[in-house]
Amino acid sequence: MRSWRWSVSRIMRLFLRWFRLCPRRGHRKRSRVRDLWNYGMVVLKSLYYNVQTNSDTVLDCMFEPIYWLVDNMTRWFGVVFVCLVMALTSSVVVIVYLCVLPIIFSSYPVYWILWHLCYGHWNLLMVVFHYYKATTTQPGFPPQEKTDIPTVTICKKCIVPKPARTHHCSICNRCILKMDHHCPWLNNCVGHFNHRYFFSFCLFMTMGCVYCSISAKDMFLDAYNAIESGRYKGGASQGEAVPGAGLIYISFQHQSSYQTPPPAFTHQERMVHKSLVYLWVLTSSVAVALGALTLWHAILITRGETSVERHINRKERRRLKLRGKLFRNPYHHGRINNWRIFFGVEKGSDWLWRVLLPSTHPPLGDGLTWDCPAYKSSTTAI
């Protein structure tokens, strides 16, 4: 008969063997899962991995449906924005002719009348001309057939070579020569052949809004005070609380035998007052907003950049700064020369005939090749 010691030792051996096998089996399972995970990652990265992929690329992929929606909606809303610009501009012109000019004719001296007539009509002509040309002029497209023109890179959307300073517009779905941006207010891209028209429209529209805001300031104050006084008298005649030295309640319950006093202003006068207030508020708001946009584009023109190139050059400047190198914009010809190239000015008299008067002259160059200063480095903005 076996002793109890032998039974205990047998049980202990079984426990030790079980504890010895369990880690091995668990380790074998974990190793199998790890192998499957590594194999899946190898397959996934072999199909989708790109060394250029970063967080910006991932965010672009995530927001691609939103970009698609914005691009397609902007294309359709461009017509609405163009109609809105035409309607607002026409309303200002009508108010000036019907409300402002009669006041000027009746109260201003002759030389001021001549000044307002000459400057106002010249500014209106420049605004209408440049807006029409900016909306109807094609920005410029690279040739589709094979040419000997040097190209910088390949468009990822069109899969065709594109020259320097050419970029793809996702709204127009085409490559644009010297693309600046897509303007929904023009329903058109701003590129090489209509960039001057766009900036001139912004400049003269800002000047026109500033002119209307300054000229109609006194008329606006008088109209606003008249509207407020009309509200005061109307509220008083109806027994409403009116502002004054405290809140005074005027009641005519005990004066039923008296007739309602006539209104302080006729319907036509009230419409004139409201029109003048609308004119001043609209032109002042547009002058501030559009003036800031015009100033920003003027800074870009002074630097010899477009809106797209500004972001590209900023990234290149940071990248080269980390390497201890200096980035220079290869299309920067100096401040004055940048403006001459932009406006297409070749001689001194061109500043009058091509800038201060309506002109349909084409820009300098064909938008395919560009002259770069002698000091340019090997780094170019693409």
UniProtKB/Swiss-Prot annotation:
The DHHC domain is required for palmitoyltransferase activity. Palmitoyl acyltransferase that mediates palmitoylation of proteins and is required during embryonic heart development. Involved in the proliferation of neural stem cells by regulating the FGF/ERK pathway. Residues 1-75, 131-196, 297-382 are cytoplasmic. Belongs to the DHHC palmitoyltransferase family. GO terms for molecular function: palmitoyltransferase activity; protein-cysteine S-palmitoyltransferase activity. It is a multi-pass membrane protein. It is an enzyme of class 2 (transferase). Residues 153-203 form the DHHC domain. It is found in: Endoplasmic reticulum membrane. GO terms for cellular component: endoplasmic reticulum membrane; Golgi apparatus. InterPro entries: Palmitoyltrfase_DHHC (IPR001594), PFA4/ZDH16/20/ERF2-like (IPR039859). Its main location: endoplasmic reticulum. Residues 97-107, 218-275 are lumenal. Pfam families: DHHC (PF01529). Its EC number is 2.3.1.225. GO terms for biological process: DNA damage response; fibroblast growth factor receptor signaling pathway involved in forebrain neuron fate commitment; heart development. This is Palmitoyltransferase ZDHHC16B. The active site is at C183 (s-palmitoyl cysteine intermediate). Keywords: Acyltransferase, Endoplasmic reticulum, Membrane, Transferase, Transmembrane, Transmembrane helix. It catalyses: L-cysteinyl-[protein] + hexadecanoyl-CoA = S-hexadecanoyl-L-cysteinyl-[protein] + CoA. It comes from Danio rerio. The chain crosses the membrane at residues 76-96, 108-130, 197-217, 276-296.
